[in-house]
């Protein structure tokens, strides 16, 4: 009998979006990847590093990547930690701040992986719901949990919380407020200024969406130096390999390419939203690189299966709050045109 911890033996685990091995056979709109390739400068940097540096250990402090991030975000590098995907930072924040039996919280629906990470640590999980107008409900006036995770823009729904609301929430918490800005580059506002204003605010970012680097597993966090120092104590000392560090620095340095990719995705998002609304879909206004859309008959399962049969992958959730709709990533204009055609073929249902 393997001597597993009881909580590990009993937990369900997180289920990521389907990743087909024959990806070229599909229009893949289920995991919010970028339809455009990384900057050519990223590919050049990776090739150079692969040819010269792989026999050496990577820089344990990811100095060059942090320096580029500092230029882009306007913080001293001591306020920044690089990560093997933003999930690494989320995990280490729980490890650093929430002990066994202590509580973390997040909004449901949002990124359910927060709960999985907390379960691994033996922390308790508390969730708060949303009203029909997407207002969080039930959060105490003064919440004393160790961590509160706020996905902004929200995923999978795509709406945003105002910076005034986030600042008010930060002031009501005795623990750390983690603003997960995985999709913020497709939105209009960021909480970075709140990191300076509040000592309990952390902002996390990923390179998987707007920088087209989901396959590299790159992320970062920005917080007060004392919290960054604590996270550095518990991360893997070589958490980013040499290729990832080179890719991160090059991606951050090529802001014109990054901004053009974001512009095209936002433009396609607006077009796709308008097309869906023409034949009766309810679409939540989105600030991410995806939309959450419900067909006229509210049968998300029917549409999901119909698209799957046509080799178009989207994300369907079994949670009763979400099962009526689909989260559809924004691909290239050509991919979205084919998706609109398929949705028209599937019709409004009953």
From Swiss-Prot:
Q: Name one Pfam family in it.
A: Aminotran_1_2
Which processes are annotated in GO (biological process)? L-histidine biosynthetic process
InterPro entries, A to Z:
Aminotrans_II_pyridoxalP_BS (IPR001917), Aminotransferase_I/II_large (IPR004839), HisP_aminotrans (IPR005861), PyrdxlP-dep_Trfase (IPR015424), PyrdxlP-dep_Trfase_major (IPR015421), PyrdxlP-dep_Trfase_small (IPR015422)
Cysteines engaged in disulfide bonds, as pairs: none
- Name the cofactor(s): pyridoxal 5'-phosphate
According to UniProt, the reaction catalysed is:
L-histidinol phosphate + 2-oxoglutarate = 3-(imidazol-4-yl)-2-oxopropyl phosphate + L-glutamate
PTM annotation (N6-(pyridoxal phosphate)lysine): residues = 209
SUPFAM superfamilies referenced in this protein's UniProt entry, alphabetically: PLP-dependent transferases
Pathway it acts in? Answer: Amino-acid biosynthesis; L-histidine biosynthesis; L-histidine from 5-phospho-alpha-D-ribose 1-diphosphate: step 7/9
Q: What is its EC number?
A: 2.6.1.9
Subunit structure, per the record? Homodimer.
Family of the protein in this entry: Belongs to the class-II pyridoxal-phosphate-dependent aminotransferase family. Histidinol-phosphate aminotransferase subfamily.
Q: What protein name does the entry list?
A: Histidinol-phosphate aminotransferase
Q: What is the lineage of its organism?
A: Bacteria, Pseudomonadati, Thermodesulfobacteriota, Desulfuromonadia, Geobacterales
Q: Report the gene name.
A: hisC
């Amino acid at each position: 009998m393997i001597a597993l911890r009881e909580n590990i033996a009993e937990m369900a685990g997180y289920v990521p979006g389907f990743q087909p091995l024959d990806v070229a056979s599909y229009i893949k709109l289920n995991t919010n990847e970028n339809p455009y390739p990384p900057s050519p400068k990223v590919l050049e940097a990776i090739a150079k590093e692969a040819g010269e540096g792989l026999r050496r250990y990577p820089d344990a402090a990811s100095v060059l990547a942090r320096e580029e991030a500092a230029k882009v975000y306007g913080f001293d590098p001591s306020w920044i930690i690089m990560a093997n995907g933003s999930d690494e930072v989320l995990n280490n924040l729980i490890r650093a701040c929430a002990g066994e039996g202590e509580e973390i919280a997040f909004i449901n629906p949002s990124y359910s992986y927060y709960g999985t990470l907390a379960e691994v640590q033996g922390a308790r999980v508390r969730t708060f719901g949303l009203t029909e107008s997407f207002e969080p409900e039930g959060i105490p006036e003064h919440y004393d949990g160790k961590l509160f995770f706020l996905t902004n823009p929200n995923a999978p729904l795509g709406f945003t919380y105002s910076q005034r609301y986030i600042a008010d929430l930060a002031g009501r918490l005795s623990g750390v407020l983690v603003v997960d800005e995985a999709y913020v580059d497709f939105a209009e506002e960021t909480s970075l200024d709140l990191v300076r204003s509040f000592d309990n605010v952390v902002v996390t970012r990923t390179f998987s969406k707007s920088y087209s680097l989901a396959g590299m597993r790159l992320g970062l966090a920005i917080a007060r130096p004392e919290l960054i120092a604590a996270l550095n104590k518990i991360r893997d000392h070589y958490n980013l390999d040499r290729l990832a560090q080179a890719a991160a620095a090059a991606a951050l340095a090529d802001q014109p390419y990054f901004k053009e990719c974001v512009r095209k995705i936002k433009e396609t998002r607006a077009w796709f939203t308008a097309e869906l609304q023409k034949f009766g879909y309810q679409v939540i206004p989105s600030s991410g690189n995806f939309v959450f859309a419900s067909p006229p008959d509210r049968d998300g399962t029917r549409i999901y299966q119909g698209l799957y049969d046509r080799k178009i992958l989207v994300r369907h959730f079994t949670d009763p709050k979400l099962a009526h709709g689909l989260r559809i990533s924004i691909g290239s204009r050509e991919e979205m045109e084919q998706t609109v055609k398929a949705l028209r073929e599937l019709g409004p249902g009953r």
